[in-house]
Amino acid sequence: MNRNDITEKIITTKVAKGITWESVAKKVGLSKEWVTAGCLGQMTFDEKQAKVVGKIFGLTAEEQKWLQVVPYKGSLPTPVPTDPLIYRWYEIVSVYGTTIKELIHEEFGDGIMSAIDFSMDIVRQPDPKGDRVNVVLSGKFLPYKTY
């Protein structure tokens, strides 16, 4: 058994029972974005959170322990994503990455945007021409230091 097996069980149970990520997040008491990432194997749950997730998805005590193991983050099955939605993000970074970098450096100086001290919010934005996906990424700016 490994973390991928637990993720597959969570997804299978989610589909079979019609569970939503938002309902899981409410029971865990955290954002739907973070909890979804955790259920998909990209974040580490603490013991209390793992028990809540375990109860929702019918996980054994051993399976709940796997939710508490630090995962190998950013583990997509291929270097260039093939899923169309994920590929759009790859494309966005390919096209706009240098622009984002330049504008962040112009505003903040030389450094990076943290993906650790980070939050994300995904909401539906109604639009008469077709609903839009509104994604807000908020990461702490971390300046490079001289030494």
Swiss-Prot record:
InterPro entries: Cyanase, Cyanate_lyase_C, Cyanate_lyase_C_sf, CYNS_N, Lambda_DNA-bd_dom_sf. One of its GO terms (biological process) is cyanate metabolic process. Gene3D superfamilies: Cyanate lyase, C-terminal domain, lambda repressor-like DNA-binding domains. The keyword Lyase applies. Belongs to the cyanase family. It holds the Pfam family Cyanate_lyase. This is Cyanate hydratase. Catalyzes the reaction of cyanate with bicarbonate to produce ammonia and carbon dioxide. GO terms for molecular function: cyanate hydratase activity; DNA binding. The lineage of its organism: Bacteria, Pseudomonadati, Pseudomonadota, Betaproteobacteria, Burkholderiales. The gene is cynS. HAMAP family: Cyanate_hydrat. Its EC number is 4.2.1.104. The keyword Lyase applies. SUPFAM superfamilies: Cyanase C-terminal domain, lambda repressor-like DNA-binding domains. Keywords: Lyase. It catalyses: cyanate + hydrogencarbonate + 3 H(+) = NH4(+) + 2 CO2. Coiled coil: none annotated.
